[in-house]
Design a protein with these regions (language model features):
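Structural/interface elements that position substrates and couple domains in central-metabolism enzymes
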Residues: 1-176
Length: 177
């Protein structure tokens, strides 16, 4: 609800542009928000290839001072052990030249705008304190329910996994009743 009107308004004001060239978009942005699916393989393992491709595109356009925010469901430690080294390698920048945080998406189907604006507090955890504070500042502008900074990206990733587990257990329990 309200998404078509919001998009139309932002486009007409010149505040929203679209491109089919991800590297161009990465080069023009200073805040990069990654929300991609994480499919499961035949071996019941997360397939992170989509995330890897997006991170590579962002890395090619990453500039000092940029902030990368990962929102998709990933195994704990993915941000620190997979995304951070990939961004450093592709961009040629050192860890302290850009920000990186995990900020789990917390939306329900059909309610995305309402949820993003403040149905739930936003959890944020960076690879360092500066990244956590930068993510916090961004999401405080967007989320009326506030921001919950956690100790690090791995903790934020675990929050996302446990929220999904909680939901799945409740659905399973309801199906058994």
């Amino acid at each position: 609800p309200d998404l078509p009107e919001l998009v139309s308004s932002l486009v007409s004001k010149g505040n929203l542009e679209a491109t089919t060239e991800p590297r161009e978009a990465a080069a023009r942005a200073s805040i990069h928000v990654v929300i991609v699916p994480t499919p499961i393989t035949d071996k019941n393992e997360p397939d992170l290839s989509i995330l890897d491709a997006v991170v590579e595109d962002i890395g090619r356009g990453l500039d000092p001072g940029d902030l990368v925010l990962i929102e998709c469901t990933v195994p704990p430690q993915t941000t620190e052990r997979r995304v951070l080294p990939a961004l450093e390698e592709v961009s040629g920048l050192s860890r302290d030249a850009f920000g990186l945080a995990f900020c789990p998406e917390r939306t329900s189907s059909g309610r995305a705008l309402k949820d993003i604006r403040g149905a739930y507090p936003k959890v944020v955890g960076g690879v360092d304190d500066e990244s956590t504070q930068a993510a916090r500042a961004i999401y405080e502008e967007l989320n009326s329910e506030g921001v919950l900074p956690v100790s690090d990206a791995t903790t934020a990733e675990a929050v996302k996994v446990f929220e999904g587990l909680y939901r799945d257990v409740n659905i399973g329990l309801a199906n058994e009743l």
